Amino acid sequence: NQIGWSGVRKRKKNLLTLIEEKINNLGEENVKILDVAGGTGNYLFDIKEKYPKVEILINEFKKSNIEVGEEVIKKNNLENISFVNYDCFDKETYKKINYTPNIVIISGVFELFEDNNMLENTISGVAEILDKNGAIIYTGQPWHPQLKQIALVLNSHKGNNKSWLMRRR
């Protein structure tokens, strides 16, 4: 029940609220969601359960996360939800996936990387494929109350044994 985890749960709740609002505005049958760095797809399974007609594509760089997510898909017999394994910071990635989303999710990734050009590549790539009536839903953790603790306790997401560092964006 540490304050940081409380914030993560609130962020998930707020993210789901925004996604559901956009789904309801577009009409469930017409929704195509892309998560640019979706991890295991955790919260998107909540969306899929509530809105089974929504099409979801989750891009994730870590194959172990994809394996976990694909197990959930298989176990629950979910349709129209899948993973791809591309570099979310490569602008060309978004052309390669051949997908025109009307909801793009960028959540919990930008604060982990220091190179602003990488982030610009993501945004530019997404902007090129986003449906004209689409929306980008972005979340960050600019005022996370436990940034120092995270840096000292968690392993790096990059696998290089450096301290975890979150940037305020």
PLM feature segments, named:
Residues 149-169:
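Conserved Class I S-adenosyl-L-methionine
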Residues 133-140:
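Conserved beta-strand signature within the Rossmann-like core of class I S-adenosyl-L-methionine
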Residues 40-52:
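Conserved SAM-binding loop of SAM-dependent methyltransferases across substrates and taxa
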Residues 1-26:
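Conserved Class I S-adenosyl-L-methionine-dependent methyltransferase catalytic core
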Residues 69-70:
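Conserved SAM-binding loop
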Residues 62-64:
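Conserved SAM/SAH-binding beta-strand->alpha-helix loop
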Residues 120-132:
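A short glycine-rich, Lys/Arg-flanked "PGG" loop and its adjoining helix->strand segment in the class I
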Residues 105:
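A conserved beta-strand element that flanks and buttresses the S-adenosyl-L-methionine
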